[in-house]
Amino acid sequence: MTLGVTSGRGGHRVRVNGPVTKGDRWQRGLAAYASQFAIPEEDVWDHMCGLVGERMAEEAIVTAGAAWVDDCLSLRDRSLIVVAALVAQGGVEARLRPHVRWALEHGATADELEALATLLAVYVGFARASVGIQVIREELARLESADE
């Protein structure tokens, strides 16, 4: 993988165009994260680097370019699967919040998100599921109040 790199302020290396990748995974990843974070595509790289550093940001953007774009699953289904995975994983509430919004944007309903967390209690335990449903409900309330 070749990187477009120039010298930036203070001698820091700055990625100009992101990595050169096979196909358009980079661009699709930027689009996916722009949608998830509700920011312009041109701001995704800096935003991600601020969150997780350059190495992880690059991997996440390229990976998202493949994971969120194919014809096997709808965006709604993918969103519900990701919400379920994050609830099951536990301890990733900050990552769960934007995925709740994204699931709604992709066609899931508030009732489906709450039912998903309730079902997960049987499989991942009540502690993780209850934290998950708490985050889901908080995010639903926040989004509802933002719409008013």
Residue ranges, per PLM feature:
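Acidic, glycine/proline-rich low-complexity segments that act as flexible tails and inter-domain linkers
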Residues: 1-76, 130-148
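Substrate/cofactor-recognition hotspot
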Residues: 79, 126-127
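Extended intrinsically disordered, low-complexity coil regions enriched in Ser, Thr, Gly, Ala
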Residues: 92-115, 129-140
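N-terminal alpha-helical segment
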Residues: 60, 78-80, 96, 113
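Short alpha-helix boundary/capping elements
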Residues: 56, 85-92, 124-125
